[in-house]
Amino acid sequence: MVHTAFMRPAANLQREPVYLKLANTLEGMIASRSLRPGDRVPSVRQFSQQQRVSVPTALQAYATLETRGLIEARPKSGFFVRRNQLELPPEPVMRPASAPRAIAIDGADPMEALLADHADSTLVPLGAALPSAELLPGVKLARILAAIGRQLGPRSVAYDMTPGHESLRRELARRSLDWGCALNADDFMVTVGATEALSLALRATCQPGDTVAVESPTYFGLAGMLRELQLKALPMPVDSADGMDLDTLERALRKTRVAACVVIPNFHNPIGFVMPDVNKRRLIELCVPRGIALIEDDTYADLQHEGPRPRSLKAFGRTEEIILCGSYSKKLAPGYRVGYLAAGQWQSRVRALKQASTLNGALLPTLAIAEFLKNGGYDRYLRTVRQAYRQQVNQMKEAVIESFPAGIGLSRPKGGFLLWCELPVTVDAVKLSGQARSAGISIAPGPLFSPGGDFKNFIRINCGYPWNSRIERAVGVLGHLVQKAAK
C-alpha cells in the first residue's frame, strides 16, 4: 500500500520517475518508523505486484534506497531496513578490575531458577537461552519419531548403547566437513546434550583441585560443573570482537598451572562474537604445547546470521588435543537432549566415564535427529531459522535502544539468539531481575555468567521468540525499571 502522506509535493511528483516516487514513499515510512531498522521489506517481486509496476522499476527503487543507506540486501534473505551504525550504543566494556586469579566456586546453581522461570508460562521468557517451539521442526520430528517407532516395533524401547548409534555419528562425521574438519564416525560419542559432553570432557582431563581457564562472561552452567567437580576457575576477560584475551591468558599461564581451557569461540554465549581464525590458531598454540586440554563448546555454531559457518578449533590441526562438544538442543529439539563430543586422545576415557554414569542414551531421539540431518531438510530449516533469529535480535536491539536509558552497551551478535546488555553502573542486575519477575518478565542477570560474580550491571536477553506485542510491552516495562534504577 502506498502511503501518500510521505510523498513529495504534487508538483514535484509529476516530474519524478516512478522508481523515485516509490523510493521516496519507502523512505518516508522509514523516517516515520512505520518500517523500523531490522524490518524486512517486501521482496522485489512482491513490491512490484503491490505497486503495480515492473520488476526492474521496483528493483531500481530498492537500489536507490540502498544508495541512500536506508536498506541493505542480505544474501538469500532479501532486503532489510538498515540501522545507521552511529546510532547504535557502544559495545559492552568487560575489562576486569584486577588481574585474573584462580578461584573456587561456591553458591547455588543458577540454572534451576532460570529453567523454572522458563517453565512458567505467565512470564515473558527473556531469561533462559531457549528458542520458541514454533520456530523448531517439532511436527516433522514427531512424524519421524513415530515412523521409526513403528519400524522398530518392540526394539524401539531399547537403549542407545555407548558410543551412540552409528547413524547419528555418521551424520556428524559428514557435517564435520562444514566445520572445517574431516572427522569420522568413530571420532564421535553421543551424549545427553552438550551439558553431559562438557562434564565428561572436564572429568576426563582434570582432577579435583585443578584449575580451568574459562571465558568471563561464559555459559553459566559451566560454573555449576566446576563446583561439583571441585575444580577452580581462572576467569579470562573477553573482547566483543576477538573473544578471549589471549595476551592475558599467556601471562596467566606463566604463573598458574592450568589443566584445561573451555571456550565458546563461535557465537559465544552470552555475547555472540566469533573468535577470528588467527586467534583460534594462537589459542591452540598457547594451550596444546603446555599440555592444556582445549575444550570447545560448539553449540551455537550452526546459527550464523549470514555467511558461512565459522570453523571449529579442530579445523586448525592438533585435533587429538582438542575436545569438541556440541548439541542439537538449541538448534532442533531441546527436549530430545541429543548432544555429542569428539574427544580425540581422551575418547576412551570419556567412554568409560559415560558408562560409569549415564551408561547409555535414548535410542528414538538419537535416530530421529540422525534421520532429520540426513533426509529431513536440516539445511533448508537452518536457512529459515537463521533469518528469523537475526531479525528477532535486531528487533530486540531496536526496542532496547528505544526503552532503555542512554549510556547502555549492546553486543553485536553474529549468530545465535542472545543479546548481552551493559546497564548504567548504578543498576544492580540481580535486583532488577527480581523486579522484572514481579512484573511478569524473566531475564538473566550478569553475575550468573561469571565464576566470580562480576558483571553486576549486565543482563542477558533471550531473543529466541518471534517478536510480538507481549514481548514489546515487556521490553518497555523492563526499560522503565532500568530507568528508575539508573537514577
For the regions a language model picked out, list residue spans one by one.
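Short beta-strand "wing" residues that participate in macromolecule-binding interfaces
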Residues: 72-73, 183, 443
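Conserved core segment of the aminotransferase class I/II
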Residues: 318-387
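Short acidic/polar active-site loop segments enriched in Thr and Asp
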Residues: 36, 259, 337
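Conserved PLP-dependent catalytic core of the aminotransferase class-I/II
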Residues: 382-408
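N-terminal basic, amphipathic alpha-helical segments
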Residues: 1-148, 351, 355-362, 371-373, ...
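Conserved core of the PLP fold type I
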Residues: 145, 150-290, 295, 301-319, ...
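Short, conserved active-site loop motifs that form the nucleotide-linked donor/cofactor pocket
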Residues: 292, 322, 408, 441
